[in-house]
Amino acid sequence: MYFSTQIVNNKEKIMDTIFCNKGCCSLQTIKKKKPKVCDPNERYPFEKRKAGVFVECGSKFLLVQSYNDCWGIPKGHMEAYDHSPKTCAERELKEETGLEVKLTDAHLFRILLDNYYIYKISIPSVDQVDLSALPQLDSTGIGWVDMECAFDLNLTVLTQKILMALSCN
């Protein structure tokens, strides 16, 4: 991967663009600190249901970078106000990418470890996701990649498993 920097206002760098080795895929990244939220009543993460959305557009799919610098599908833990894994997945997708969708049961792709719900959707245009909105999103990076280039990134284990399952189909 190689980098190019974007400059805005007062020559202040706010985002970097990362390109794959072939130059066909680009991802936007930004440095930001994870907001600290401490809830003394929160249970251990493995006790919570989690949900995520695999978003594809043609041969590319959407990845977000989390605060630990790993790339993966938009995903997260269910909150008390999430009525179902589906609403959790919709909320996480909006928070991390700005993309608003209404998922159906037909979008359910896999359930992993009995508590991780993965939905899969296709969208007609990559322009439905505004990559320049990254500073307002709950992620530190976002972009579209193809299957071959994705494996050059620091992928989450979950995303690796999803890509392996998709490549076997």
UniProtKB/Swiss-Prot annotation:
Domain of life: Viruses
Entry GO MF terms: hydrolase activity; metal ion binding
Domain Nudix hydrolase: 46-169
Keyword Endoplasmic reticulum carried by entry: no
EC number annotated for this UniProt entry: 3.6.1.-
Keyword ATP-binding: no
Keywords tagged on the record: Hydrolase, Magnesium, Manganese, Metal-binding
Listed cofactors: Mg(2+); Mn(2+)
Signal peptide: none
Motif placement: Nudix box: 76-98
Amino acids binding Mg(2+): E92, E96, D138
Ranges that cross the membrane: none
Family: Belongs to the Nudix hydrolase family.
Protein name according to UniProt: Putative hydrolase 111R
Organism for this UniProt entry: Invertebrate iridescent virus 3
Higher taxonomy: Viruses, Varidnaviria, Bamfordvirae, Nucleocytoviricota, Megaviricetes
